[in-house]
């Protein structure tokens, strides 16, 4: 234990760099791919330096590391023998940084366990900003920076990139997992419990208002899984989902345009008297193509970015 404290004091600047970059990730993801990719690269390089300096070999000899290295080797071999090796290797070779990033997070949890609670707070603040700005844009037609809503679809700080729903639906599992890991801090206090309830409901409604049908499907699918499989939190998710659906029903009753895009158009695209589709004809064609590629390359696949 004393050796870990010694390492932390000796390398405080580098550990704090990793710490703050991880806390800023929820915000940097809103800006686009460049800043989060740069952050992950800096975190990975910093951890490599700490690994060499402090001989952190245990992290690299774990079962997780061995599994990843096998996966990484197979991934690059697949890229090498793919239809366009150069294009595929551009993706598979740099994938290694995500492995180092995961090890850096693992290391940080060991030397600074409070990172999990701090990351949860960071995600909550980021989601609150997006949610408040999103509802502001929905009501007034523009967000607090004056960026106008695109048609009826809410995008908040993503501007003309209509991915607000995708962001919320994909960060939600991390958010809820961290809530469970910090159970004593959040679920034993009524204010935080109410805050989580509002966040869950707001994420559902705002994903609907973003007009992203796939994201809305994911968020509802995760809600159903949580309600069915969770023991301690199913009532919280059930009531937050019910409240969100009531709000969505109210919104669609006032403005039927939202219902037409998310519900009516989806039902229309899923099938007609002649042919039935999975979500839409475009989705179905993607699934058929993916299945054919799988049947032709069952063991290795066709390589990253070769779809």
Language-model segments: what does each one mean?
Residues 23-25, 72, 76, 100, ...:
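Alpha-helical transmembrane segments of multi-pass inner-membrane proteins
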């Amino acid at each position: 234990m004393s050796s870990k404290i010694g390492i932390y004091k000796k390398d405080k600047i580098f550990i704090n760099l990793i710490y703050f970059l991880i806390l800023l990730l929820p915000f940097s993801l809103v800006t686009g791919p460049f800043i989060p990719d740069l952050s992950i690269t800096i975190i990975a390089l910093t951890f490599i330096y700490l690994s060499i300096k402090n001989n952190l070999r245990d992290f690299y000899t774990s079962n997780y590391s061995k599994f990843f290295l096998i996966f990484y080797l197979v991934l690059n071999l697949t890229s090498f023998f793919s239809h366009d090796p150069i294009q595929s290797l551009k993706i598979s070779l740099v994938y290694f940084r995500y492995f180092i990033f995961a090890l850096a997070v693992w290391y940080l949890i060991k030397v600074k366990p409070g990172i999990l609670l701090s990351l949860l707070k960071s995600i909550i603040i980021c989601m609150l900003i997006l949610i408040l700005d999103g509802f502001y844009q929905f009501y007034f037609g523009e967000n607090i920076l004056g960026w106008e809503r695109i048609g009826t679809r809410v995008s908040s700080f993503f501007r003309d990139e209509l991915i607000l729903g995708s962001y919320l639906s994909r960060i939600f599992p991390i958010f809820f997992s961290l809530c469970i890991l910090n159970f004593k801090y959040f679920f034993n206090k009524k204010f935080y419990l109410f805050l989580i309830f509002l966040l869950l409901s707001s994420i559902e409604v705002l994903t609907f208002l973003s007009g992203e049908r796939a994201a809305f499907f994911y968020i509802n699918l995760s809600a159903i899984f949580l309600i069915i499989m969770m023991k301690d939190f199913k009532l919280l998710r059930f009531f937050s989902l019910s409240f969100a659906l009531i709000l969505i029903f109210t919104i669609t009753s006032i403005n039927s345009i939202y219902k037409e895009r998310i519900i009516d158009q989806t039902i229309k695209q899923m099938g007609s008297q002649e042919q039935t589709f999975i979500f839409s004809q475009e989705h179905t064609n993607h699934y058929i193509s993916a299945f054919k590629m799988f049947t032709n390359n069952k063991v290795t696949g066709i390589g990253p970015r070769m779809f």
